[in-house]
Design a protein with these regions (language model features):
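A glycine-rich helix N-cap at a beta->alpha junction
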Residues: 49-76
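Short internal beta-strands
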Residues: 33-39, 66-71
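RNA substrate-binding interface of SAM-dependent RNA methyltransferases
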Residues: 27-28, 37-38, 42-43, 52
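Short, glycine-rich nucleotide/cofactor-binding loops
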Residues: 3-18, 40-46
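Short, well-ordered alpha-helix to beta-strand connector turns
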Residues: 30, 64, 89-91
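C-terminal structural segments of small proteins and small subunits
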Residues: 77-96
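Short, well-ordered beta-strand core segments
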Residues: 2, 66, 92-94
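Histidine-anchored nucleotide/phosphate-binding helix
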Residues: 15-35
Length: 96
């Protein structure tokens, strides 16, 4: 499984979009992929679950990409999980 970690701020730049697109492209190629949100991206989603970053992240549902975070957020498709365990399961980790 490839783990895409999205931690960049959706307010400052669009690097997070590249992370989401990478996850969607991998899923479209039928490669097992999951997304972990943390850092500035997680802070933004926690403060405003309707922000542009959260809406774009919602595309992961269409490709059945699992989305995780360290803490509970107000998005039904994001699951809170122990991130250390998730990172151990990944064969590759890519950070955006």
């Amino acid at each position: 499984m490839i783990l895409i970690v999205i931690s960049s701020s959706p307010v400052i730049d669009n690097l997070y979009e590249q992370g989401i697109e990478t996850a969607l492209n991998l899923a479209d190629a039928e490669i097992e992929v999951s997304v972990l949100i943390e850092g500035e991206f997680l802070n933004c989603v926690e403060e405003n679950p309707q922000c542009t970053g959260a809406k774009k992240l919602g595309q992961c549902k269409l490709y059945e990409v699992s989305v995780y975070s360290q803490s509970k957020v107000d998005l039904p498709f994001v699951k809170a999980i122990d991130t250390a365990n998730l990172q151990q399961q990944a064969s590759k980790i890519v950070v955006f």
